[in-house]
Amino acid sequence: MKPTSLPKNFTNNPAPKAVTGFKLDNGRAYRKLNEAWPVYEPLDSTKDGKGKDKDGWTTSGASEPKGDAPLVSSTGSQMSAVTDSQQSGHNSGLVSLAQRSTTVAVQKSDSSGFQGQGTTDNKFQKYLNTAQALHQMGVIVPSLETWPGKPSTGIATRAGGGVSVQAATRQSSSTNEDLPNVITQLYHTSTSQLAYLNGQIVVMGSNAVPSLWYWVVDERTTSGSATWWAKTHLNFGTEVQKSFVENQLGFKDDSNSDSKNSNLKAQDLTQPAYLITGLDVVQDHLVFAAFKAGAVGYDMTTDSNASTKDQALAWSTTAGLDSAGGYNNLVENTAGLNGPINDLFTLLDTFAYVTPVSGMKGGSQNNEEVQTKYPVKDDSKASAKIASLINASPLNSYGDDGVTVFDALGLNFNFKLDEARLPSRTDQLLVYGIVNESELKSARENAQSTSDDNSNTKVKWTKPPRTTSPCRITTVPISPKRVTEEERSSGNH
């Protein structure tokens, strides 16, 4: 089945200037399935970084998320199911989250290993961990008990219609690191691979695709607003890393945030991240499904009996896009939205699926709004609200009527799509993109030609050694001499 044709007027869709990026300056651009994955250090593309400075990160700000984030471990049956999927060579397109459902156990832990009050029914008291979402998306996360102090080799494997990575952790020089280096694992899971094409993993980096970052959100009722945190306990460049994550995911909501985030404030917009939720190859074209991780809204209900009280509810990326003007705004980028990545991907379509408000909101009248903050225009961020929950499940390549809400958001609803329930407002955009082999080659060459270390629009690639040429995706024309030889050998000359 060929991909659908582009909607009218979607051929000229410029990408915005990104403010953060990855510089891949070592390793090979393409990796074989049986090779270990390199760990690239993510850098702020402004070289020196203009995110939070050292003084902007207090002791509690740097350590609290690590100490309180719930831990997630996989069950034996889940790992077995993943193994079966790998062995079967499943290749049926982007599998919906409903088809990839797994069972996970959630525990609370502080930095000393103390087990807190997290429960197995996905109700969190303070922080939210994305490990569950990674399980749902087909990214294999080894059991936590095998991680501390036991670095392993990351192996890429084919699983569930996409490429999963059983990622390695890094040996820690810190005696206090009792949790795995999650952000490093997710970094090379998301930015060192996109999909399986012609027997290889296609490796691409983009300053607009920092997908699958580990994040936690502060849900304390006293905070009054959604607040971004990120686990940044790394063995290299911690301050640069903190600046990068803060710039990409949105600044921490405190009195000094605006002045310390000059990169983002210059655009009057906090930059959303793309989350790659599904990957596939259709007729030698790389296809990805992604949604933009903007803010996590949480229920502001005052009803103490509401099942959703104090839980994170939704990811919101845009404020007030309606069905009539949404496409136009996305294409023209007048609302500060991210378009196709560096003009390398062609936007095919956007989708927005939300759960009905009735029966799924807090408050006795089911009419209390969910408040969100990022990313919206600076002058309206305090008043931005969403009135419905957003589904973050990818469709497969050809559409899927099974819709699942991220378990990691504390919502465990599975339902069939009912178009009558879809409102006109689209708070969440699901973006489908497609790129062919020649575009991949052009993208690599274009990135390699970039010499400006402060480039905000391109990614620097290290040219792979000549010995790795079989791994490179190129189009090689058949020379006249070769044709002549083939004709001669076949007796047709």
From Swiss-Prot:
Ranges annotated as biased composition (Polar residues): 1-14, 72-92, 445-472
UniProt region (Disordered), positions on chain: 1-92, 441-493
InterPro entries: MgpC
Biased composition (Basic and acidic residues): 25-34, 44-56, 482-493
Disulphide-bonded residues: none
Pfam families documented for this protein: MgpC
Family to which this protein belongs: Belongs to the MgpC family.
Protein's recorded name: Putative MgpC-like protein MPN_414
Species this protein is from: Mycoplasma pneumoniae (strain ATCC 29342 / M129 / Subtype 1)
